[in-house]
Design a protein with these regions (language model features):
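Non-heme Fe(II)-dependent double-stranded beta-helix
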Residues: 2-26, 36, 45-116
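A structural signal for well-ordered alpha-helical scaffolds and beta->alpha junctions
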Residues: 28, 114-118, 159, 217
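Short strand-connecting beta-turns/loops that link adjacent beta-strands
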Residues: 48, 158, 171, 229-230
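Short beta-strand segments enriched in hydrophobic/aromatic residues
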Residues: 59, 166, 240-242
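A generic secondary-structure signal for well-formed alpha-helical elements
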Residues: 63-67, 125, 244
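Catalytic core of non-heme Fe(II) oxygenases with the double-stranded beta-helix
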Residues: 102-104, 109, 118-212
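Catalytic core of Fe(II)/2-oxoglutarate
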Residues: 175-180, 184-261
Length: 261
């Protein structure tokens, strides 16, 4: 694909190339406010509707040769409980494809390489200068969830997660999060209530294809519900850092892709 960024991103709706523009400053202010509470901000239609189907097809082709892995994990929950004698594993089942498999002129890679997006995100997160990851595998990667797959309840090791929804699942695949529940008095009871569906503060978000989402998940317990029906849920995950040249460990690469290079 050789489209310009203006053909891919709806710059009329989101004029983020000009950070000084009043519309962009208003968008930044809104994003900062929503990331502060509840910790989640979306930009529906960030990718033009006429482009979404093509990028989803490209992603689906790459994921067909991707690496599927399933695991039960406790660390994301356990770390948040301190010394509480509490363990409740959650399941993660997902297929991943590395950015190094994307063509140089891929629209997916064009989005990630577009400096105004990086600058906009850094401004929103309050981290400037801000850099896209130098890791060609993990920095710009695809995740695919087929029927039966899911991303169980967990906390992120850091805030500032950036994702782009390329294709909604035919059923299930809803993003759910419980804002700011990490730690504190009675944490275990809160976690159990969230995971049992009894917590009144849980938020459900059903993103449409083309939506850019920003999320602070370090203190918010969150998950993607099991996929119930085709088509697959396909998401582009974008990584950034406050320092240039950031790369991920071989263990992380192996976990995602079953390979290190």
């Amino acid at each position: 694909m050789t489209d310009t960024i203006a053909d891919i991103v709806d710059l009329d709706r989101y004029p983020i190339a000009d950070l000084a523009a009043p519309e962009t400053q208003a968008l930044v202010a809104e994003a900062k406010a929503k990331l502060a509470d509840p910790g989640y901000f979306t930009m529906p239609g960030f990718i033009r509707a006429e482009v979404v189907e093509a990028v989803a097809a490209e992603a689906g082709t790459l994921l067909a040769d991707g690496h599927w892995h399933e695991r039960l994990r406790e660390s994301g929950i356990g770390l948040a409980t301190g010394n509480y004698p509490w363990h409740r594993p959650t399941r993660a089942a997902v297929r991943c494809a590395g950015g190094d498999r994307m063509a140089a002129n891929s629209a997916l890679r064009q989005i990630y390489a577009w400096q105004p997006l990086t600058d906009f995100l850094g401004t929103v997160f309050g981290v400037m200068p801000y850099y896209s990851s130098a890791d060609r595998m993990v920095g710009c990667m695809l995740t695919g969830y087929a029927p039966g797959d899911e991303l169980g309840w967990h906390f992120d090791p850091n805030d500032g997660v950036v994702t782009l929804m390329l294709q909604k699942a035919g059923g299930g695949g809803i993003f759910e999060f419980a804002p700011k529940v990490r730690g504190g008095e009675g944490a275990v009871e809160v976690y159990d209530a969230v995971m049992d569906g009894r917590w009144p503060g849980t938020v459900s978000e059903d993103q449409d294809a083309g939506t850019l989402a920003l999320f602070n998940g370090h203190r918010s317990l969150h998950r993607v519900t099991p996929i119930d029906a085709a088509p697959d849920r396909i998401v582009l995950v974008l990584s950034y850092d406050s320092k240039p040249g950031q790369v991920f460990s071989d263990d992380i690469r192996r976990n995602f892709f079953g390979r290190t290079s």
